[in-house]
Amino acid sequence: MHSIVLVKQVPDTANISGQVMKEDGTVNRAKLPAIFNHEDRVALELALQIKDKLGGKVTAITMGPPRASDVLRECLFMGADEAVLISDRKFAGADTLATSYVLSEAIKKIGDYDFVFAGRQAIDGDTAQVGPQTAEKLGIPQITYTEEILEIKENSVKIKRKIDGGYEILESALPVLITVLKDASFPRPYKAKRIMAYKNARTLIELEKLTEGNSLLYIDQLKEEYQSKKLYIQTLTMDDLKLDEARCGVHGSPTKVHKIESVVLAGGNHEMIAPDKAGMSILIDKLMEDHILG
């Protein structure tokens, strides 16, 4: 079984600071600390559980700037077999429509897969659109809001998914795209052995930086060396995927973020009431005055 997992490095929305909006309506992610989107970690965990039971491999892919390689190294620490960074300046400012187009074409290039996993949604946009849109572009079934994988057969999977007021059991043919809820599983911790093994994994962009100003290092040789050590993170650009530029980045994105802000709930005026019988009487009187009681 081959599982491809869509992961994302997201801005830590709990710590919004500085000027995070650009004039063109896109988010300046460099102004925010970056973290591994939690539901994507859970999606990776489910993919790894399938590998543990049935064998096969797990490939983690992400679309983002060069620094998004950090989240791919975390995937390798957790147990992924391969990692792919999809990065190009022409992808900047992509909304879910443009993102799903790029991801679907990357998945087609990787090919030969049984499952595509993704978190239900990312905490930066909360749209829950990329997974379903990617499935549509791939022309494969999709099951969203997954709580549990119940059974896997050679050509099908049975899944429990959350719905309003309960759950439903669905069976789908393979390949299938599955979006995962945050409580579907608990992500395994990173293993020290894998951290030591993959902490030096590098993308092509990072290898190119190593060769800058060093005439003794040649990028092709360095790439070959890292590939032989299984430390190379495959890097795909718009040209590698032969994409339509009009469908990428800002040009292919009809959606724009109008505003983002940190909402702080501040307490108003309050009155301390003693925790005794007299205080209880005062509290009841005030609740009755406000028509909360009586």
Predicted feature descriptions by range:
Residues 1-294:
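N-terminal glycine-rich FAD/FM-binding segment characteristic of electron-transfer flavoproteins
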